[in-house]
UniProtKB/Swiss-Prot annotation:
NCBIfam families, per database record: rsmG_gidB (TIGR00138)
Superkingdom of the organism of origin: Bacteria
Keyword Methyltransferase tagged: yes
Protein name, UniProt field: Ribosomal RNA small subunit methyltransferase G
Keywords of the record: Cytoplasm, Methyltransferase, rRNA processing, S-adenosyl-L-methionine, Transferase
GO molecular function: rRNA (guanine-N7-)-methyltransferase activity
GO cellular component, one term: cytosol
Residues engaged in binding S-adenosyl-L-methionine: 77, 82, 130-131, 146
Organism: Bartonella tribocorum (strain CIP 105476 / IBS 506)
Lyase is among the record's keywords: no
Record InterPro entries: rRNA_ssu_MeTfrase_G, SAM-dependent_MTases_sf
Similarity section: Belongs to the methyltransferase superfamily. RNA methyltransferase RsmG family.
Length: 213
């Protein structure tokens, strides 16, 4: 590895210990594909390109250790592949597990499928609106979403996919407390808050036992 990649590898190990160099190489390949495709379709904001590794890849990577034992994952509104593709890369290293991605934008679906094929990832992309795939998605241990919708709306989208044991890992920004308060008016749920290792003003909400009033 050259010095810049070695530095990125050290940063990754701070987030997810014991990551293989093969996994690191897959993440670097993913980073390269994002940059190539972003010139043609809007996968990430141009303003965040200089911080792609930290703001998007490491930010996604921090989710995996929270439930690394889980085998069946589902990511809603997958967009440019955060956190879904990053999780898929870690699942590939485990040699077990699978993640289903749901995305309605055809160009982004094409990108996601290209990445999955090139990196040989254990993932499937559903080209559909979330509301249209409830009967198609296999039962999931973990559901993820990043920047998709306010928590109250997000729980409404997630609810039909839940089992008694399903856990939602939802990345939220500085207004998360207001979102939790608003959602609590309509939903019962157990909540664990994990402060982001990337941005101290952001959190990962670990939500379980979701039920409506």
């Amino acid at each position: 590895m050259d010095s810049s990649i070695e530095q990125k590898y050290k940063q990754l190990l701070d987030i997810v210990p014991s990551v293989s160099r093969e996994t690191m190489e897959n993440l670097i390949q993913f980073e390269s594909l994002i940059l190539q495709w972003n010139a043609h379709i809007n996968l990430i904001s141009a303003a965040t390109i200089p911080d792609l590794w930290t703001r998007h890849i490491l930010d996604s990577a921090q989710i995996f250790p929270l439930c690394s034992h889980s085998l069946q994952w589902c990511d809603l509104g997958s967009g440019g592949g955060f956190p879904a593709i990053v999780i898929a890369i870690f699942l590939k290293e485990k040699r077990s597990g699978h993640i289903n991605l749901v995305e309605s934008n055809g160009k982004k679906v094409a990108f996601l499928r290209t990445v999955i094929a090139q990196l040989n990832l254990p993932a499937t992309v559903y080209h559909a609106r979330i509301e249209d795939i409830y009967q198609k998605i296999p039962i999931s241990d973990i559901i993820t979403a990043r920047g998709l919708a306010p928590l109250n709306e997000l729980l409404q989208l997630i609810f039909p996919l839940l089992t008694e044991k399903t856990i939602a890992l939802l990345q939220k920004g500085r207004d998360y407390a207001t979102e939790v308060k608003n959602a609590s008016a309509n939903w019962h749920f157990d909540l664990l808050k994990h402060t982001s290792k990337i941005d101290e003003n952001s959190v990962i909400l670990e939500i379980s036992h979701i039920r409506s009033y």
